[in-house]
Amino acid sequence: MKKRVKRPNIFVYSLFFLICKVLATFKFKLKVIRNELKKKKGPCVIIANHEASIDFINLTAAVKRRINYVISNSFYQTLGIKSLLNACGVIPKQQFQTAITDLKKMKEVVQNNGTLTIYPAGLMTENGVSTIIPGSSGKLLKFLKEDVYVAYTTGSYLTHPKWSKVYRKGRITLDVYLLATKEEISQMSVEELDALVIDRLSFNEYENQETAQIEYKNGDNVEGFENVLHLCPKCQKEFVMTASGNTFKCSSCGNQARSNKFGFLTNIKDGDIVFKHPNKWYDYIYELLKNEITQTENYTLSSHGKLQMIEGKKQKFVEVGEIDLTLNSKEFTLNGQVHNQPFNLVVSIAKSPMLPFSPGKSLEIQDGPTIYRFIPEDGKIVIKWIMALKIFAAKQSA
């Protein structure tokens, strides 16, 4: 068989491992609870929960095996270090879309005695709670036909949240254990495997913090969180929340909340409406939007903004035009000017039940191999797009 995926280059990966080990030990204070891969020989698959962008650093440091990571194609195309990523044996793929060539590459890793790592959720959490895990993990694990291990991380969200402008030093833990042998997997149904994966990879960082009670340096800083918690729970107005240091404040009604170094919120004055766990605030906003969508016939969401696409030679996103982006219960519509030419594209949400996004900045829509990055005029609306898509996708799958 002609190799499509290289085993990680031993020299490049050794340097990569050393860097990860130093960061995990001294910067992230990684604590490994157990590592059942220590005595494992031969190929295997690792499935991991995804709390933050630093998760791969801690996993690499803890597991002394050359790992082939499945990573976002957007990340691969725009980081500017393709040659190094190739040397590390990564498999780039479109998020939430798995092509036959992707499957062949993943299969090839384990057939060549390698270690394949997958993040089934595909996205980092924006609120400390695990994102939706697509129901395709069971089929993939059955296809790979190898022992499967879980790498379960806690604390990386509180260390480096997706929305945060600052890093917070505290504690990250990692638990690596055998989920099922290939023989056990062959005896399980796809539905049983899907349920098992969801059960073992689900997390709630704020519930965990109630027991762990770990302080994080700068852990009370909420700047950037207003791009996720964008609606005031007191006056229920959107995009009015501001954040400075450890304090949220509504610019409309004056409602305030203060964060502590554990990541919990408290009221500042009598009459403030505050959720101790930020994810509960997120859920409150989500339910309000869900009710609005349910009660509004033919609900649509529209925004005007700039459109970017990946420039291959430059290995980065570049602006190509301006569009109006519209979302309804079935599809996205992109309508405007691209490269000074009329542009219209319709993308079914069945192809994109979830979107890569940067809170307060942008979201990405995938159409086959093409990635479109949309930057709305008001970045605060990005999270509303994400919530609306979740609601529509949930209705479609119900």
Predicted regions and their residues:
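Soluble catalytic domains of membrane acyltransferases
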Residues: 3, 8-9, 13, 17, ...
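Broad, structure-driven detector of short, well-ordered beta-strand segments within folded domains
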Residues: 151-153, 240-242, 257, 321-329, ...
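A broadly conserved sequence feature marking short terminus-proximal activation segments
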Residues: 171-231, 236-238, 370-385
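Cys/His-rich short segments
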Residues: 217-272
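Long, charge-rich boundary regions
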Residues: 258-338
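Phosphoinositide-binding peripheral membrane targeting modules
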Residues: 309-361, 372-379
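Short, acidic/hydrophobic/Gly-rich beta-strand patch recurrent on exposed beta strands
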Residues: 363-367
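Terminal and domain-flanking low-complexity segments
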Residues: 381-398
